[in-house]
Amino acid sequence: MGYRSEVHIAIPKRDEKELDAIMKEHKLLEGDYPAFTKEDYKQKYVRYNDNNDLIDERADYVIYHGNHLKWYEGYKDVDAVNSFIWDKPYDCYNDEDPFGRMMVCIGEDNAIHSAIGDYYEIFNINMVVELR
């Protein structure tokens, strides 16, 4: 069986074709039950312009969700996706290119076991405890 993970990836819309090609090469977006689903997302944020006015902005992202995956380094598909994200990770303090790539992996024990980039700028991770 092995340890299973939820994998959440966010990339700028401009990078979608490149990641799709990598995922298609490894058959991660194919079939009746693909490893990943994806959706468009508009991130809202505010910034100050040159006149010190507060400006509302939006950034276009593509979000990929994978569930119940074996996400181990050393697997060819995992290494290909991780390498792509590591190439331009999101850093909220980088003013030159404020829109990078990010990923967060959550294990079946609800622990974050790996992350690339400042994922918390897009993903809000919560653990919910409910009564049965």
Predicted regions and their residues:
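Charged interaction segments
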Residues: 24-132
